């Protein structure tokens, strides 16, 4: 009887396992780390020991969360350049892609890795980890630590996966109907030339990344670990799962293999109380508030004077108040209805019911926050996936795109008035918000579940498709197509020569010897 009670009691006891988790995030883009940071913090809250190497350390220490600053490593020289500079690099999807490759190649070099003391020390660490979490956006340099620790790893990407990321997961990314994230091609039906350029982009992206970025980083891999270790290309194909910032309300609908986990909105927390001055400014606005922010990389103060003045003119003509994230000390010509600050709690501002409009560059984190709260958006895309994000809002009736080159006082004013005064935009944004929130689990709970799943199942290799290990010509069925063409051509040739020989034979039977059919020569009389 005692034994029976013991079994009954133990059946209600849940055993919690604590894992050692390593995170390495040297890529210096705050929104990129902001996408995955909530997962890392949540894992620490659940009792796991989390060690993170990142360029944005927190001001206060968290339990179970050990943070090492790598902000001095791999610094991008172009960070916070003038907006006009970014515009020139993003003239086309191809120029955006090449610019991204150039910057990545320039920064993630062996000499910069050698200068990064925290990561060099990590290469010599004897600590045992159960899992690596890292970002593989443009660089795969952090996969060095898979060779070091021989552990399963999870990667994240702050947008829809690039072709090289989909390829390593064996995930289909068909350019015939899935537009690349640097383009503004329609989601529903691309034209012939859209599909042509889209296909060329996919080929260049995949080939360029493997030939340029991976080739450079492979030298670093071989330098530290020797020539006998697995290549970064092969390591990348061992990715357990990839957490992607994608959702069908904001991105093209794409097929996903089990290892591709969409967690768009993972960074969206419950809104916190606003600073008193901002809350007072919003609450006292009879006609509502417009929030204007160009993200963490693009600084509003770098707007050319004529662009800045266009917004100042438009803002001075509307009854709404304006919150403008302005990084400079003084905003010249600021009207009384404008409040500026170098930093603003964007997520909490967008959650306020008196915020009527969000003017943004179209970054995916800010766009998803606006969608979550049902706030219409005017998007001014500058580079990267921003144009695609705004096009998605436009297609859903929840926003409009404002081309940077079209900015003028009258154009900005007309767009603001239309999106605020026409109720269809607010209603479309509300419907989009409902669809965006309608999920079986929260994005954060989803990410936590799959992270622990990978550890429990030793890397979860059963989630991989056979496509991961297939040569490209087999994956594209080129060998099968070539064989079928060979069979078809062979059959056609057999039929052709069979008919030809048969006809010749029949002619011989009907008309006698074929030589008798030839015309006879006239004998010339002498």
Curated annotation (Swiss-Prot):
* InterPro entries cross-referenced by the UniProt entry: UDP-glycosyltransferase, UDP_glucos_trans, UDP_glycos_trans_CS
Query: Which protein is depicted?
Result: UDP-glycosyltransferase UGT5
- Membrane topology for this entry? Single-pass type I membrane protein
Which ranges of this chain reside in the Cytoplasmic compartment per its record?
Answer: 496-526
User: Any idea what job this protein has?
Assistant: Catalyzes the transfer of a glycosyl group from a UDP-sugar to an acceptor molecule.
Q: Which EC class does it fall in?
A: transferase
Region forming the signal peptide? none
What SUPFAM superfamilies would the database entry show?
UDP-Glycosyltransferase/glycogen phosphorylase
Q: Which lineage?
A: Eukaryota, Metazoa, Ecdysozoa, Arthropoda, Hexapoda
Biological source species: Dactylopius coccus
Q: In this UniProt entry, which residues form the Lumenal topological domain(s)?
A: 1-474
